[in-house]
């Protein structure tokens, strides 16, 4: 019973993140690494990845290198060097209750902008 409840909470977090990311203009959802990793792109560039096979919700976002270091120092257990990514430009964010929803959205928005969201797709 408790296990089912924890799975439900996990899925709610994933769905909330997914809904937020998909609410951003021109976002494409893909699964290039298999069904256990959702990858979101803007203008063909990845800016948000979330694994579906972890006990805790965690996701990767692009980040300005200087800001990435600051965040890792400020939140050492919630903001880690990007897992399987260029650690200078990517952070792994652990959704463990330390970071607020506002902070999570700011990190997603920053990544979205870094991936080139301000430029429209050429048609």
Regions found by a protein language model. Name each.
Residues 2-123:
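Charge-dense, helix-prone N-terminal extensions
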């Amino acid at each position: 019973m408790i296990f089912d409840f924890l799975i439900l909470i996990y899925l709610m977090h994933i769905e909330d993140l997914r809904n937020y990311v998909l609410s951003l203009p021109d976002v494409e959802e893909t699964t290039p690494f298999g069904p256990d990793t959702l990858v979101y792109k803007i203008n063909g560039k990845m800016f948000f990845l979330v694994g579906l096979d972890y006990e805790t919700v965690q996701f990767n976002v692009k980040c300005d290198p200087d800001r990435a270091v600051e965040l890792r120092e400020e939140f050492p257990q919630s903001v880690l060097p990007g897992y399987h990514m260029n650690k200078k430009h990517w952070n792994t964010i652990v959704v463990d209750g330390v970071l607020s929803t506002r902070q999570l959205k700011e990190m997603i928005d920053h990544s979205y902008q870094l991936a080139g969201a301000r430029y429209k797709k050429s048609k």
